[in-house]
């Protein structure tokens, strides 16, 4: 592969970044995959698969591994960032000096900035300046299923219509990967952050043993919280009925491939927060997102009772069953009020 003929450079060689790189390469594109740990990248190159996360999925020939960041970024103008939300800003600042003059940035990171609760678009603008085109992809995607070529659909949003069109064409594969465009840049970002929080609650409910009725109620009222917060931030409420909202919410609340759900289940079964995180062994985005989403809601005066109770459990030591009873004991109200 020549240094400047790749369709996409993927930053982040974890399970999801690898799965997206495989999907792009399988679609017939030349792809460069870079990760921060050279030893890990060298192991991927030697095995031609990600043995840690996706051991049964061989890399297509058109997927190139790269340990040198400057070389990886020189290979393509299109850069897909797939890193945890708490390091998102740091990674973009690391990329900035090496980006091509015509670079365009899209991310699959789901969450808000650690501590500040800012949307990732604001973090990206601060790190990269005002001229680089930005986009986000989000939706119901488990890395193992995506890498295996199982049917998957996501949403894509960008303020730059040309970039959005190019990305949709680049990512879309009629055989297995469907990409819906969405003009709501804020909503597509926010859905991926809030669903992480609600998934912890759904897992916690199941861990306690409350059953399907309670889980479904949490999903439904969690969607209401997501929609209220989105409306306050200027998002289109209909976005939350799509892939980046309801789609991702249902997936992560109901399937044990979700780290957030498994984390919540452990808490519901009586495990402490640190032990549950250690047991998962990977980043649980919803843990940090809970604090950040609640702070954002309070800033905008949005009521989010599920998120608030989860914050009490995660950061104040409240018992999970007691938190559930606090939600059930709230004042009676109209289901559709302030949606």
Curated annotation (Swiss-Prot):
GO terms for molecular function: glycerol-3-phosphate dehydrogenase [NAD(P)+] activity; NAD binding. The keyword NADP applies. Its EC number is 1.1.1.94. Pfam families: NAD_Gly3P_dh_C, NAD_Gly3P_dh_N. Keywords: Cytoplasm, Lipid biosynthesis, Lipid metabolism, NAD, NADP, Nucleotide-binding, Oxidoreductase, Phospholipid biosynthesis, Phospholipid metabolism. Sn-glycerol 3-phosphate binds at residues 110, 139, 141, 195, 248, 258-260. Gene3D superfamilies: N-(1-d-carboxylethyl)-l-norvaline Dehydrogenase, domain 2, NAD(P)-binding Rossmann-like Domain. The active site is at 195 (proton acceptor). InterPro entries: 6-PGluconate_DH-like_C_sf, 6PGD_dom2, G3P_DH_NAD-dep, G3P_DH_NAD-dep_C, G3P_DH_NAD-dep_N, NAD(P)-bd_dom_sf. One of its GO terms (cellular component) is cytosol. One of its GO terms (biological process) is glycerophospholipid biosynthetic process. PROSITE patterns: NAD_G3PDH (PS00957). Pathway: Membrane lipid metabolism; glycerophospholipid metabolism. It is found in: Cytoplasm. Its main location: cytoplasm. It catalyses: sn-glycerol 3-phosphate + NAD(+) = dihydroxyacetone phosphate + NADH + H(+); sn-glycerol 3-phosphate + NADP(+) = dihydroxyacetone phosphate + NADPH + H(+). NADPH binds at residues 15-16, 36, 110, 143, 259, 283, 285. NCBIfam families: PRK00094.1-1, PRK00094.1-2, PRK00094.1-4. Catalyzes the reduction of the glycolytic intermediate dihydroxyacetone phosphate (DHAP) to sn-glycerol 3-phosphate (G3P), the key precursor for phospholipid synthesis. Belongs to the NAD-dependent glycerol-3-phosphate dehydrogenase family. This is Glycerol-3-phosphate dehydrogenase [NAD(P)+].
